[in-house]
Amino acid sequence: MIISALFVVGHDCAHEALFKSKFLQYWIGQIAMLPSLHAYNQWGYGHNRIHHGHTIKRQADFVWHPTTKEEYSEFGIFKKLTHRFFWSIWGGGFYYMIEIWFKGMVLFTAPLKEAKRDKLIMLSFAFISSGLVFILELLLSPEFLILELVCGCLQRFV
């Protein structure tokens, strides 16, 4: 819940709705979006220029893009299964992580000079925080981590 609330703060900063100062808007937005692993300017470009600029326009809005019956009938079996899963109640999170976050935040770089820097900040935060969580778990409960690693490795062979 806290990460979602912080994301909303970052969203409002990206819309330049919270502060008059662009400096404050950027840094508060950047910090607020880091826990959800979103690069501030990268996300702002995709959200403000592409999504809001082309909301519900077929082939332009990368977030909301319904498929016609004709398009769906031309899909192969794997694409049909993927499409049905992504648009089901269970698939929304997977859809977001793959189609929006991974393809839009990690693979794509917005044509803004700040986008590369923000992506580097976000990816650095992701790797450093993951490493810190691993180290903390090791320091606080080494036997649990070792058991987890051994059991995880053994499960692959069973």
Locations of regions flagged by a protein language model:
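Post-HEXXH active-site segment of zinc metalloproteases
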Residues: 20-35, 63-64
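Internal helical hairpin/lid segments
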Residues: 149-158
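Acidic (Asp/Glu-rich) catalytic motifs at the cytosolic membrane interface
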Residues: 3-22, 43-56, 158
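Non-catalytic, topology-defining segments of multipass membrane proteins
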Residues: 1, 34-150
